[in-house]
Amino acid sequence: DFIKSEIGHRTNVIAVGNSGNFVTMACSNSPELFNRIILVNPDSILTCAQTPGRYTKFYKEFLDLPIIGTLLYHIAVSKKSLRKFAKEYAFYNPHLIKKSYIDTCYENAHLGLSPKSIYASVHCNYTNCNIITSLKKIDNSIYLIGGSDLYLEEELLKEYLSYNSAIEYTLIHETKYYPHMEKPNEFLSTVFLFLS
């Protein structure tokens, strides 16, 4: 709807992480609205296909409790937890992690009417969707960009190729989950190369 009402023509889209699932599904439903799609470190196809199980449903109910759930949420999105996530998983070079980045993540985790509900839905697989059929159906150009130092990232990107051989991918060396923040110039040149 946003592309139809605001942009008004075919557009290129860049999506990071699990937001790529929504872009893939939207492109499958309305391919005429999309030109090229760039997915940065998309979730594995197996992760996309996971649905809420018994444990995750219990965890979601637990997080929805007013006092205990809110306490767990605040622990999960504390500055200490965000810093640990950034150092261990998100960034190749921990010296690139700016205090402003952690502050922004922390602030965004507390904005809105119910950020705890979004957190619970994402972590308990309620926002996942199986994209295999969509990947097979899409005829638009799809490019994948990954951080070379994420565990098994190249294998994950090759998994996408097994469902649509027209997909292309590249890895940006010495980056992890946020190559656009760790090596912005290299990321931009890669994007311009894909879009030209």
Predicted regions and their residues:
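Catalytic nucleophile serine of serine hydrolases
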Residues: 17-18, 41
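Conserved loop-alpha-helix segment in the C-terminal half of the alpha/beta-hydrolase fold
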Residues: 139-175, 181
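Residue in the alpha/beta-hydrolase core beta-strand immediately N-terminal to the catalytic nucleophile
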Residues: 12-14, 36-38
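Conserved acidic catalytic loop of the alpha/beta-hydrolase fold
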Residues: 1-11
